[in-house]
Structure formats: C-alpha cells, structure tokens
Amino acid sequence: MSRMRLIVAGAGGRMGRALVRAIADSDGAELAGALEAPGSELIGKDSGLLAGLPANNIKLSADLWAMSAEADGILDFTVPAATIANVAIAAERGIVHVVGTTGLSASDDAVIKSVTKRAIVVQSGNMSLGVNLLSALVKQVAKSLDANFDIEILEMHHKHKVDAPSGTALMLGRAAAEGRGITLDGHSARGRDGITGARRSGDIGFASLRGGTAAGDHSVIFAGPSERLVLSHQAEDRMIFAHGALKAALWAHGKPPGYYTMDDVLGLKDLF
C-alpha cells in the first residue's frame, strides 16, 4: 500500500517542525508539502533542514492549492485565520484535514464543521493518547461526583503560547460539563482577580500559567468537602502531539466524509 502524502501547515513553527520529523520517521506517510504564511522569511527554506533533519528538497511555500494537487492530507497546527483558509482548499481538493489549531471561535468551528458533508476533518484540542484518555476519565468522574465537588482546571504552557485557556483545558472543561449535563459556555469562570465574591455553584473554573518551555501540563481538580481528587497529565515533548496527529491522518485516510475527533481515532467513545 502506498504511503499517505501529507502537507504540514505552519512547517516553520515548533509544532510544524515536530510534524515534519514525525512524518520522516513514519513507514506509512511521506511529506508532500510544507506550508508557511505568505511573507514569511522562511519561504523557500528546506523543511528537512529546518526540522533538524537532512535536506528533503521540500521547500516552504505559501501556495496550498499547488502543493495539495498530489496530496492526501494536511496536518494543521497554525492560527485560526490560517486554518479557516486551509479548510476551504482541503475540502475542495478532497483531502483529509487534521485540525489541531487552538483559539478557534464558535464561528470558526462552525465553518470547519460546515464542510464535513463533503470532506474528512479530524479535530481535537489535543492529539495525545494520554490527554484523550484523561478527557474520558474527567467526563466519567464529573458524572459520578455530585455538585458538592467543585471543578477547577489548571494549565501551564511555554511562554510563547498566545491563547488562554489552552485548547486542551477547554476540551477538558467541555468533558466535565458534559459529565455534569451542563454547557461550558454557561458555566465557565476565568480570570478571577480582585474582590470576586464567593464561587458560583456549578461553575467550571480555569487558571492559566505561562513560562519557560513547558510543553503542556493540565490538572482537573474535583474539590469536595474535606477531600480533593486531581486528574493530571504532563506533556514532556511535543512529539506526542505530532505522533497523535499522524495517527489521526492515517486512520482517517479512506474514511467517508464527516467530522471526527480523537475519540473516534482512539476508540474511546464506548470506554465507559
């Protein structure tokens, strides 16, 4: 069976370079293109060399339409505006679109889902096995514990991360809300400062820390009367996200059009 030909969006960034390395290590995929933002000083650079690998003669380019002509999929960990632009082209080309971009708005998510009647999209706030297992556990614990247990989510990332709370924190918050039978939008508490008053019952709180080179630490705290339960995950290397994204692309190749998540890829929907 031929290898899946994949484009890496944002190939010059930290995550993009990790994706290039993951593809180079894979027996089931090969790099078909390296996408970078128009005007970037990295346009024309060799994607292999940028990723710390031998030269692969695949240069960074801003022309997704051209590079997608012979591709089977795109791995997209960029910024919301770029992802939304990529969605239309990926759908038109009929290639798998793996979306790991965070900071997307509700309207952005609606645009992504709007193409899935004719396109294959796999989207997740986090592509690692551990975090997706954590999400399933959070949902089950939130369902099992009563409202006397307050839910707080703490996350830490490197100092260069531009959005907060992280996409993973929001993913865990949605899992907790689903377990409680509520919506996160109506029960989210963020950025507490000053005289805030007592904690509102039923809220799911978020706190974000930024510093150093942390790849991603997440803890979900269930704080009850006289006891606390803490479920945590620490990412030690962003390669776990790259390998997860690659797994998602290979899983989705040949699937019917639709909207999929890592729960589908990892078979977690029927875990509990």
Swiss-Prot record:
Signal peptide: none annotated. NAD(+) binds at G10, A11, G12, G13, R14, M15, E36, G100, T101, T102, S124, G125, N126, M127. InterPro entries: DapB_C, DapB_N, DapB_N_CS, DHDPR_bac, NAD(P)-bd_dom_sf. Pathway: Amino-acid biosynthesis; L-lysine biosynthesis via DAP pathway; (S)-tetrahydrodipicolinate from L-aspartate: step 4/4. GO terms for biological process: diaminopimelate biosynthetic process; lysine biosynthetic process via diaminopimelate. Disulfide bonds: none annotated. GO terms for cellular component: cytosol. The keyword NADP applies. It is found in: Cytoplasm. It is an enzyme of class 1 (oxidoreductase). One of its GO terms (molecular function) is NAD binding. Catalyzes the conversion of 4-hydroxy-tetrahydrodipicolinate (HTPA) to tetrahydrodipicolinate. This is 4-hydroxy-tetrahydrodipicolinate reductase. It comes from Bradyrhizobium sp. (strain ORS 278).
